[in-house]
Amino acid sequence: MSFSSDVKEELSARLDSARHCQIAEFAALMGMSGRIRRSSGGEMQVEMLTENEVARYKFIVLLETIFDIDSSDILYISESSRDTSIRICDQKQVAKILQTLKWTDDTFEHIEPVFVDPRIVQKDCCKKSFIRGAFIAAGSISDPNKFYHYEIVCDYEEDAECLKDMLCFFNLDAK
């Protein structure tokens, strides 16, 4: 197992006691690997697509903890030999998740998936939780005994800037 995998596994074992921090970490997992999709019947679904077992595990733990979703309500679909899709199809749960992430309001007239809503990462502890979730979903780190390199890969430049700002907030030199 690589050093980066060991670090991710160690970080994923941590479960914040504060719900707001759990939500921030979940928001990072969704921001990095999640999406909203429509079923063939037109119903909304929340989905995380990843080959990362640690991120998959953390996503499920947070779903169960934050939203009290039973594991029997989670749909697992193998997309390829490596990728697994985790979907929530229950419309009440989907609505609850979207509202918690601030991706929609009570009317559901406008749904806007954003990397992270600023209200979710107002507190320092929530910023740390978000960074942890982003690292678990899309980060890597080299063994500091060899050389130091830490990165989190973002799909969009504005997401990378947002994450960079959070890292700089803690005086970490992010580029």
Language-model regions: role of each:
Residues M1-I60, I66, V114-M166, F170:
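Intein-associated homing endonuclease modules of the LAGLIDADG/DOD-type, together
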Residues D173-K175:
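Compact structured core domains
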